[in-house]
Design a protein with these regions (language model features):
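Bacterial N-terminal signal peptides that target proteins for export
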Residues: 2-10
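Bacterial Sec-type N-terminal signal peptides, specifically the leucine/valine-rich hydrophobic h-region
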Residues: 17-20
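Phosphate-group recognition and catalysis centered on beta-loop-alpha active-site segments
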Residues: 23-391
Length: 391
C-alpha cells in the first residue's frame, strides 16, 4: 500500500451558496467550475498535519472559520466529523447532540446556540445513543434549513475562553461546504488540501434510517474524490461501516482505535462478537485491519503512554502497523495544559487554559515514527514539523 501517491489534483471553485434540498438523501451537489491545475506533489506529505475539527483551539470547532484558520496556519488536511440531518444532509459536528442537558436542565455541553432559539427548542428530546441516554437536541430531528438558522458556540469555554467572543458568528457547515473550502483554499495556496471525514455513530444512524455510508461516498463521487488518488481519508471508530465503504470506494480508509472499550458495532452484534479495540491492535488484528483499511488512528497514549506525569517509552504499535502495511495517524495533540502531560504543562500547571510545551510533545511522537497527527492548533503543529530533527 502506497500511502503517499504522486498525482495531479484538479480543483474546482468555492460555492457561494448551498442548495437546501436533499437529492436522493445525500448532500448538496457541487457546482461545475473552471478547472485549475495544481502542480504535481506528493500527498499527503509525511509527517501529515491534520487539523482536528479545524483550528479548534482558535475558533469554535467544525466551522468554516476554524477550517480556514487551520489551512492558513499550515494544515495539510482538515477533519469534519459527520452526522446527518432529518432530511439527509451530512453536516460537520462532533456529535449529533448539538446541545446536551444535565438532569437539572442546565447545559452540560453545546456546540450551537439552539437553547436560545425558542422556535426550535421544542425539539428537545431524550434518546439512547450507543448505549448512553442523552437529553438534548439532535441533528436527526431537524432539517438542514432549521440547522442553518443556528450559530456555532465554543464547546469547552472553560479551557478556550478566547473562542467565546466568536460565539454566534458562524453557521454549521455541510460536508459539501467543507469540500468546497478545501478546493478553494488549495487554489489560493497552490497546494493540495485534503479532507478527513469521520462517520459518527454509524450503527445508530443506520438504525433510524439515515445511514451515513452511501451519503458520504455519493458526495465524494460528485466531487471527483471517490478514488485512491483523492485527497481523502475516511475514518470511523466502528469496523463494519468501514468494511461496507471499502466495497463502495478505493479512497483511503483509516480505522480509529481507542485505548479502552469496543467498537459499538461489536457491542451491538451481541454475544457472538467479543472482540475489543485491544484485539484490533495485536499483530493478527492489524493484519485483519489491513484487509479493508490503509491505516490506523490510535489515541496518542496507545503509541506513547504517560508514566508518572511524563511521556514514557513508545509501544510497538507503530512498528507493528508498518509491518502490516498500515500508516499511523495519532489523535489528538492539543496545546493547552488541560491536555498535556504534567512535565509539559506551563506554570501554573493548574491553569488549564495556558499553552504548554506542545511542540515538544508533537516532536516526541514524530520521533516515535508516526506518519501524521491530529492537532487542534495547526500553527503549533507546523512549527513542530519545521523544527523537527530525526534522531
Amino acid at each position: 500500500m502506497k500511502h503517499t501517491p504522486l498525482f495531479n489534483v484538479a480543483l474546482t471553485g468555492l460555492l457561494s451558496a448551498i442548495a437546501l434540498t436533499a437529492c436522493g438523501g445525500s448532500d448538496e451537489a457541487p457546482v461545475a467550475a473552471p478547472v485549475v491545475a495544481v502542480a504535481a506533489a506528493v500527498f499527503p506529505p509525511v509527517p501529515t498535519l491534520i487539523a482536528h475539527r479545524g483550528a479548534s483551539a482558535l475558533r469554535p470547532e467544525h466551522t468554516l472559520a476554524a477550517y480556514t484558520q487551520a489551512i492558513d496556519d499550515g494544515a495539510d488536511i482538515i477533519e469534519p466529523d459527520l452526522v446527518a440531518t432529518k432530511d439527509g444532509f451530512l453536516v460537520a459536528r462532533h456529535e449529533n447532540a448539538i446541545a446536551i442537558l444535565n438532569a437539572d436542565g442546565s447545559i452540560r455541553e453545546s456546540t450551537t446556540d439552539i437553547a436560545t432559539r425558542p422556535e426550535i427548542a421544542s425539539l428537545l428530546t431524550t434518546k439512547v445513543i450507543d448505549g448512553t441516554s442523552i437529553r438534548g437536541w439532535l441533528t436527526e430531528d431537524m432539517t438542514l434549513a432549521q440547522l442553518k438558522t443556528m450559530r456555532a458556540v465554543e464547546r469547552i469555554p472553560a479551557i478556550r475562553p478566547g473562542n467565546v467572543p466568536f460565539n454566534g458568528e458562524f453557521q454549521v457547515p455541510t460536508l459539501q461546504e467543507v469540500i468546497d473550502l478545501a478546493k478553494s483554499k488549495a487554489i489560493e495556496k497552490g497546494r493540495t488540501i485534503g479532507v478527513y471525514p469521520e462517520t459518527k455513530h454509524p450503527t445508530y444512524f443506520k438504525s433510524i434510517g439515515l445511514p451515513l455510508e452511501r451519503r458520504l461516498i455519493d458526495v465524494l463521487a460528485a466531487n471527483g474524490w471517490n478514488s485512491k488518488e483523492a485527497p481523502v481519508f475516511i475514518q470511523s471508530f466502528e469496523v463494519g461501516n468501514l468494511k461496507e465503504m471499502r466495497g463502495m470506494t478505493t479512497a483511503r480508509i483509516v480505522q480509529l482505535l481507542s485505548s479502552a472499550g469496543r467498537p459499538f458495532d461489536f457491542v451491538a452484534a451481541g454475544p457472538s462478537e467479543t472482540r475489543s479495540y485491544a484485539d484490533l491492535v495485536t499483530p493478527a488484528g492489524l493484519r485483519e485491519v489491513a484487509t479493508y483499511a490503509n491505516g490506523i488512528g490510535p489515541s496518542k497514549d496507545m503509541v506513547i503512554p504517560v508514566v508518572s506525569g511524563a511521556l514514557g517509552t513508545p509501544t510497538a504499535l507503530v512498528a507493528n502497523a508498518k509491518a502490516a502495511n498500515l500508516i499511523t495517524h495519532i489523535y489528538t495533540l492539543r496545546p493547552e495544559n488541560a491536555f498535556l502531560p504534567t512535565n509539559l504543562k506551563r506554570a501554573p500547571a493548574t491553569d488549564n487554559t495556558l499553552r504548554g510545551e506542545s511542540v515538544t510533545e508533537i516532536q516526541t511522537f514524530l520521533q516515535a515514527g508516526v506518519d501524521g497527527f491530529f492537532t487542534d492548533e495547526s500553527a503549533v503543529g507546523r512549527a513542530a514539523i519545521r523544527t523537527f530533527v530525526k534522531k
